[in-house]
């Protein structure tokens, strides 16, 4: 089992933003966290990657893989850096914490990431010169450093135009063939196109948790779960 969460709660001030969250996600699943804005999706993801703590110790109620890649909704890119320079910086940072690599291996890792996410033609540019779609590819490449077992993507297609949207969705589908992916979205079509399973969250509670193959009408299911 890639992810196991048991009875997780989170308060922010007096607001109970996550209520008794329980879920199990298997290896190789692509799971969509679907819900309206403010439902608790991003909060759950931040707890999973260790940015925030749950009310009780996360060690007792979250069992996660050792390696996790994370793409936050507001992707912090250093726009003055070149694409290769940016990725090399994060390879140095990440690999220092995980294991030692020689300069040659680090360079090879950067080139593999660039090729994997389709950045070859843009790799010589500064990050700030890239379109929104290519910036998301840079963010995905950063999240994949170290070949993580689990990839957590918070609203990965926000702000993309229709062509960029389809490109990033196709890329995430490809990435999801050999690892577990959890992505958050409020777009139903996104879940239909990319996910094998949907978890609908509203007001901090899981309302629906089903394989997509068991859902005949996602729109109706979503409406009924979020009334």
Locate each region found by the language model.
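Conserved ABC ATPase "signature" region
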Residues: 88, 92-95, 99-122
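Helix-to-loop junction immediately C-terminal to a conserved catalytic motif
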Residues: 49
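Catalytic Walker B motif of ABC-type/P-loop ATPase nucleotide-binding domains
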Residues: 151-155
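Helical segment within the ABC ATPase nucleotide-binding domain
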Residues: 165-177
